[in-house]
């Protein structure tokens, strides 16, 4: 169940840390320390440096968050198909 008072932002993984922790650069330029949510961990979704992710932040501590979704990166072939 999703909580109402969370702040959700998008960002890019910049560093992989031990214990499934990651440093994420948000779109506004801030860096946060984020861990993987249970659904991502349970479904063995790989998160690598450079991936775009959605991060939930608590309004009480904006320096820590939880990665809830890995965004799909459009490949070059997909963009060429759209042009034709």
From Swiss-Prot:
The keyword Transmembrane is assigned to this record: no
Gene (name only): infA
Pfam families: eIF-1a
Sequence ranges assigned to domain S1-like in this UniProt record: 1-72
PROSITE patterns per UniProt: S1_IF1_TYPE
Species, as recorded: Spirogyra maxima (Green alga)
Domain of life: Eukaryota
GO molecular function, one term: ribosome binding
Keyword Protein biosynthesis: yes
Self-association state and partner proteins as the record states: Component of the 30S ribosomal translation pre-initiation complex which assembles on the 30S ribosome in the order IF-2 and IF-3, IF-1 and N-formylmethionyl-tRNA(fMet); mRNA recruitment can occur at any time during PIC assembly.
Physiological role: One of the essential components for the initiation of protein synthesis. Stabilizes the binding of IF-2 and IF-3 on the 30S subunit to which N-formylmethionyl-tRNA(fMet) subsequently binds. Helps modulate mRNA selection, yielding the 30S pre-initiation complex (PIC). Upon addition of the 50S ribosomal subunit IF-1, IF-2 and IF-3 are released leaving the mature 70S translation initiation complex.
Protein's UniProt name: Translation initiation factor IF-1, chloroplastic
Chief localisation class: plastid
Cell compartments where the protein resides: Plastid, Chloroplast
InterPro entries (alphabetical): NA-bd_OB-fold (IPR012340), RNA-binding_domain_S1_IF1 (IPR006196), S1_domain (IPR003029), TIF_IF1 (IPR004368)
Keywords attached to this entry: Chloroplast, Initiation factor, Plastid, Protein biosynthesis, RNA-binding, rRNA-binding
Family label: Belongs to the IF-1 family.
Gene Ontology CC annotations of this record: chloroplast; cytosol
Gene3D superfamilies for this protein: Nucleic acid-binding proteins (2.40.50.140)
């Amino acid at each position: 169940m999703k909580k109402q008072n969370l702040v959700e932002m998008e960002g890019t993984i910049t560093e992989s840390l031990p214990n499934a922790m990651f440093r994420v650069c948000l779109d506004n330029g801030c860096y946060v320390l984020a861990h993987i949510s249970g659904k991502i961990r349970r479904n063995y979704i790989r998160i690598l440096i450079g991936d775009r992710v959605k991060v939930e932040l608590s309004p009480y501590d904006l320096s820590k968050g939880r990665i809830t979704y890995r965004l799909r990166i459009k490949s070059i072939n997909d963009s060429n198909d759209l042009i034709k």
